[in-house]
Amino acid sequence: MTALHTIEFQKRGLPHAHLIFWLMEDTTNPTPSLINRFISAEIPDPNEDPLGYALVAEHMIHGPCGPLNPNAPCMKNGKCSKGYPKPFQTETSIDPNGFATYKRPDNGRFVQKGPHRLSNQWVVP
């Protein structure tokens, strides 16, 4: 794998990164198994991977929004503009246009955000 990046500083001084990765194998027609090697929409097992669990809980959970928080900034016309919560998905799939729908198993794992238990349906890949 090869990577190239640039970091810009926005008007308020916050960094903004642009990243590009070149993978050494042919990725022109990705398969679900290839996608699963690099992208995950699952909460890690807190006993097997406590650091991964903590990082996903802190940085990769959307919301809550929808009926759990109708005043969330992402809400437009009573629905989440980002499509959360996403439906559970047993396997990663790719539609005819090449759009991937990521695996989101209903495995009982959750992240507690205030009074809400957020499952894999709320993970931002």
Q: Which residues fall in each region the model found?
A:
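Extended, structured polyanion-binding interfaces
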Residues: 1-125
